[in-house]
Amino acid sequence: MNVLGIETSCDETAVAIVKDGTHVCSNVVATQIPFHAPYRGIVPELASRKHIEWILPTVKEALARAQLTLADIDGIAVTHAPGLTGSLLVGLTFAKTLAWSMHLPFIAVNHLHAHFCAAHVEHDLAYPYVGLLASGGHALVCVVHDFDQVEALGATIDDAPGEAFDKVAAFYGFGYPGGKVIETLAEQGDARAARFPLPHFHGKGHRYDVSYSGLKTAVIHQLDHFWNKEYERTAQNIAAAFQACAINILLRPLARALQDTGLPTAVVCGGVAANSLLRKSVADWKHARCVFPSREYCTDNAVMVAALGYRYLIRGDRSFYGVTERSRIAHFSKRGGDRLAAQRSAASQPLF
């Protein structure tokens, strides 16, 4: 089954064709970074207009690279939530129209579920496993029971990790997008130049949560307080110290979730999963296997959308043409985290 996937949830116009859920026939991503870089962040209206301009040429390019025509397509999958409303609307409307005109089955998928599905394109994974999704808009720690069943354990209580990278990079004039430029600078810096604090939560129910507002404040407004005077205040050292703390914030709930669930595997996905320090930090973990998608499948892409759509379509699922875009998803229930907390023995000493 050849599934054409369309992803326009943010600022990338992406189209891919995937056969039988794992064989990537084509993967086209039209990036808008040069257009948003002058604003040091994504401008939603500009993103929507670029999607309108690029969606048809990107579909044509994906078909050409796969050496296929629309007659060879067996189904269409598209992201409908969460994301920027205008951006989602472009991809969803195009997908509906194309599916209707070609009499093809159509499925609207969740962008976050698709990120986890990206790992299944290249790896043979068994459910359930612990999931960590870290991107510019989300942070989620969960147990993934199936391609459409995600049990949330924790999430960000304020800012997403990718957003923190962008904000710090923008403040210091490092460039845009912040994730890659900070990683590059950090390679020449020393993380010991500053010791930024990890977040501390008060009250119950936050064992698997993350927070980045405090780190952003420390790096941007309180650098003097946390700086090690033995080190020169360079862009490289600032980037290295910030990156080390930002990654540690993610590692702590991931390790806790693996410990508490007893599951042997974790999938780490989303744009921040492309970060080399994050990948290296878990490479030597003895108690679990951490699986990452290839870097090209960490950032927004349509391969993950097509792969997820295939799983729905072979199950016989279809979306109604009345399905709408949703900028936000329903609040994740954290009953999973509460359940695990109740199961942990009060006498046991947590390792993380």
UniProtKB/Swiss-Prot annotation:
Q: Quick check: keyword Iron in the entry?
A: yes
- Positions bound to substrate: 133-137, 166, 179, 275
Record's subcellular location: Cytoplasm
Record SUPFAM superfamilies: Actin-like ATPase domain (SSF53067)
Which reaction(s) does the protein catalyse, per the Swiss-Prot or TrEMBL entry?
Answer: L-threonylcarbamoyladenylate + adenosine(37) in tRNA = N(6)-L-threonylcarbamoyladenosine(37) in tRNA + AMP + H(+)
Q: What is its EC number?
A: 2.3.1.234
Q: Which cofactor does it need?
A: Fe(2+)
A GO biological process held by the record: tRNA threonylcarbamoyladenosine modification
* Amino acids binding Fe cation: 111, 115, 300
Question: What's a GO cellular component annotated to this UniProt protein?
Answer: cytoplasm
Pfam families attached to this UniProt entry: TsaD (PF00814)
Which GO-annotated molecular functions does the record name?
iron ion binding; N(6)-L-threonylcarbamoyladenine synthase activity
Protein name per the record: tRNA N6-adenosine threonylcarbamoyltransferase
- Source organism per entry reads Treponema pallidum (strain Nichols)
